Amino acid sequence: MNTSRLFSLFFQGNLVKRIFIGLILGLLVALVTPTLQNVLGFNLAEKVGVLGTIFVRSLRAVAPILIFVLVMAAIANKKIGAKSNMKSIIVLYLLGTFLAALSAVIAGFLFPSEVALATKEDMTSAPQGVGQVLLTLVFNVVDNPLNALFKANFVGVLAWSIGLGLALRHASESTKTMVSDLAEAVSKIVYVIIAFAPIGVFGLVSETLADKGLVALGGYIHLLAVLVGTMLFVAFVVNPILVYWKIRRNPYPLVWTCVRESGLTAFFTRSSAANIPVNINLAKRLNLDEETYSVSIPLGATINMAGAAITVTILTLAAVHTLDIQISFFSALLLSVVASICACGASGVAGGSLLLIPLACSLFGVSDDVAAQMIGVGFIIGILQDSTETALNSSTDVLFTAAACIAEENKQV
């Protein structure tokens, strides 16, 4: 009975609660390891740390193929409405995502974060400036597609997935359906791996804290504060500026309504897709154009990913600072562009934004092993980070839709 209850605790129910339990158990193991080592004759934290290593290797294995099929399927099957103000909404979505990534770059430089990693590699090939980063980017783009998958060249994987996705837009419906089914199949594998996240976090926390000490928690707390702080800045400073640009009046009543009615629900559901009915209901109560919001809100749940762009950017810069890689601000600016593109592929996948971190890390020569460890760090702080990210993403969907609709009404008056 006890074994059955323990199994249910780790593999069923709310993922956030299970990760929190894994975090607490990992902390306890790290605390008791020095005492038990003399009794047991081995390092308990080191032994359970293998669980974290297996989890990280699983993430490394699935990330390249996930990005490849997900982006390809999304582009091949994308249908954008013909409404005149849809273009305005899409511009807001993409501009908002880019400005969120740019805000994250600035925050990453102003408040640099470092976290404890299992390995700190000697990064002798660290990029010297934006020129070298761009040259590396071009070389990675023209890589052989199979080699890109085998070597985890995420930029090459992204380039080929975009190219094939655009080509497949003209394919038959049966071919598009097959591509979508393939993406769904890979996503299901990801869900299985994510189900083991509590055990992975348990192993990672145990080994990290036993090795680095409780001081390692300070790095996690600082990183989380930078992430959440940047998301709040985007929600209450950047987004209102964009809304004012469209409607030319005080944006905060509308911003607050969207955060209260949509963001709060999304914070607890942790799913932009699950929050679509909430956003549609809010759009209806705001008397927005139904033909517009019925298309723009589901589309926003797919491509409007400001929170994901912030997560990818901040965690990538944390890896860069941890490894003491010197990069220019313009190189980091390129990161914000890549993070914006990456974020559009994060929708509908468990831990989607975290699984795109290796792609961004590859810009600066960070190994896929270290990048995978940053994914693990993301899961550790994900108890709060993921909820805040989803709240920002989902509330922005209805906010930008409302701004575009109001701007359209103002033109007609």
Swiss-Prot record:
InterPro entries: Na-dicarboxylate_symporter, Na:dicarbo_symporter_sf, Ser_Thr_transp_SstT. GO terms for biological process: serine transport; threonine transport. One of its GO terms (molecular function) is neutral L-amino acid:sodium symporter activity. It is found in: Cell inner membrane. The chain crosses the membrane at residues 19-39, 61-81, 89-109, 148-168, 189-209, 223-243, 297-317, 325-345. Pfam families: SDF. It catalyses: L-serine(in) + Na(+)(in) = L-serine(out) + Na(+)(out); L-threonine(in) + Na(+)(in) = L-threonine(out) + Na(+)(out). It is a multi-pass membrane protein. GO terms for cellular component: plasma membrane. It comes from the Bacteria. Its main location: membrane. Keywords: Amino-acid transport, Cell inner membrane, Cell membrane, Membrane, Symport, Transmembrane, Transmembrane helix, Transport. Belongs to the dicarboxylate/amino acid:cation symporter (DAACS) (TC 2.A.23) family. NCBIfam families: PRK13628.1 (NF010151). Involved in the import of serine and threonine into the cell, with the concomitant import of sodium (symport system). HAMAP family: Ser_Thr_transp_SstT (MF_01582). This is Serine/threonine transporter SstT. It comes from Pasteurella multocida (strain Pm70). The lineage of its organism: Bacteria, Pseudomonadati, Pseudomonadota, Gammaproteobacteria, Pasteurellales. The gene is sstT.
